[in-house]
Design a protein with these regions (language model features):
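A structural signal for short, hydrophobic/glycine-enriched beta-strand patches
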Residues: 1-171, 216
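A conserved mid-domain beta-alpha-beta active-site/ligand-binding segment of alpha/beta enzyme cores
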Residues: 161-218
Length: 218
């Protein structure tokens, strides 16, 4: 990644990441994807006493279905167990294939456990914080929740995800594609609107100009 790309991507990263205060909750919800740091961060939050339960949500999505044989949620559970989280505090949602399904299917499980009206601490990738927040407000507007993510810089996140089998360009393509999805998904009713600031729009257009188009829709 050259200097121009790094500068533009940094603008996108800072806007997509909400940096909400981490508060104690009744359940941690770890959203599945290719990056294992979400499971590690969820286990860390549990061990630090932020919540007594963890729900891992994720079947196989567009970046994991060709790489893994087990669901994202089951992979995350195994990581959490290795990190000392007791198995009996972990809930599994392993049917979802996208963020909307993550939320809807997780809500079903949490309802059955008497946790749907409790405080939730949602964990996803740093650049997914804003998109998950907007999707939660759409699919589950009454939810009491905050967003957090693994404590990684942009460069660390890219490095960690590359270590799990993606190229640098593929990782960046996903981040750029999610900026486009902020508008398209709001138009489709998948999340509440999050208008792009002009600086972010210019950064997105710069990344497209530089060829980071692999995850764009259309």
């Amino acid at each position: 990644m050259d200097t121009a790309a790094r500068e533009a991507l940094s603008v996108i990263w800072k806007w997509m990441k909400l940096d909400m205060p981490v508060e104690k909750a009744d359940c941690i919800v770890g959203f599945g994807c290719i990056n294992d740091d979400i499971a590690i961060r969820s286990a860390e939050l549990y061990r630090e006493g932020y919540a007594p339960r963890i729900l891992f949500s994720g079947g196989l999505g567009r970046n994991t279905k060709s790489r893994w044989s087990c669901s994202e949620a089951e992979r995350y559970r195994d990581i959490a167990l290795e990190l000392g989280v007791p198995e009996d505090v972990i809930l599994i949602e392993n049917r979802s294939t996208n963020t909307g399904e993550n939320i809807l299917f997780s809500r079903e499980i949490l309802s059955a456990e008497g946790l749907a009206d409790k405080r939730l601490l949602c964990v996803h990738k740093p650049f997914m914080e804003r998109r998950v927040w907007a999707a939660m407000k759409n699919y589950w507007p009454e939810a009491d929740f905050t967003m957090t993510s693994p404590r990684l810089s942009m460069e660390e996140y890219i490095e960690h995800t590359m270590a799990q089998g993606m190229t640098e360009k593929a990782v960046i393509d996903v981040i750029v594609g999610d900026v486009q999805r902020m508008e398209i998904y709001a138009e489709k009713g998948f999340q509440i609107p999050q208008p792009l600031p002009e600086l972010v729009r210019a950064a997105f257009e710069k990344m497209v100009e530089l060829g980071y188009t692999g995850e764009l829709i259309g």
